[in-house]
Amino acid sequence: MEERSGVLETSRSCKQLIGPEGSDKEFEGYIDSNLRVVETFLRLFPIGLCVTALVIMLKNSQENKYGSVSYTDLGAFRYLVHANGICAGYSLFSAIFVALPRLSSVHIAWTFFVLDQVLTYIILSAGAASAEVLYLAEKGNMATAWSSACRSFGPFCHKVTASTTITFVVVVFYVLLSLISSYKLFSKYDAPTVSNPSMGADIVAFHG
């Protein structure tokens, strides 16, 4: 009887040890699954926004008695079109890739981390450049004797405002995506190591 009771106690203790680990794994799987769903939608939403901003700017031209103006006349607006096109393509590709289950490795995590950062800065710089040009078109510049162009080309400026505003909304989405890709990389994988031949050992590249 004592031997049997000892076996039962041992099995119970094993279950107690295994139980929390199993529940932790289930919880981590639940978090990863929900995070993948959220990330997929965050990558899908910018597609429509980028395409909308791109189309608005592409069709933006005006001609009246004062002359004619088109988005192609200004480099900042051309940059905005290209940036939104790149953003739409990358968002679609990355959303499809993220939605696929069990495709995760340190190389993939690093790739998404870097690309998300790059896209964030590309979209941000495109929006900032367009906003600066729009400000000059709206307010003019007394120091250089530039008058307000938007007084003569109001509809053109309104479309620029709409396209630029949508672009900044896309920036918000990509800031969130950058945070998610950073979390997925640095919470799951160790810091990269750099070989040091003189010491004959590997050194962690990040110092905490």
Swiss-Prot record:
The chain crosses the membrane at residues 37-57, 80-100, 108-128, 160-180. It is a multi-pass membrane protein. Pfam families: CASP_dom (PF04535). Coiled coil: none annotated. It is found in: Cell membrane. Residues 58-79, 129-159 are extracellular. GO terms for cellular component: plasma membrane. The keyword Cell membrane applies. InterPro entries: CASP/CASPL, CASP_dom. Keywords: Cell membrane, Membrane, Transmembrane, Transmembrane helix. Residues 1-36, 101-107, 181-208 are cytoplasmic. Homodimer and heterodimers. NCBIfam families: A_tha_TIGR01569. This is CASP-like protein 2A1.
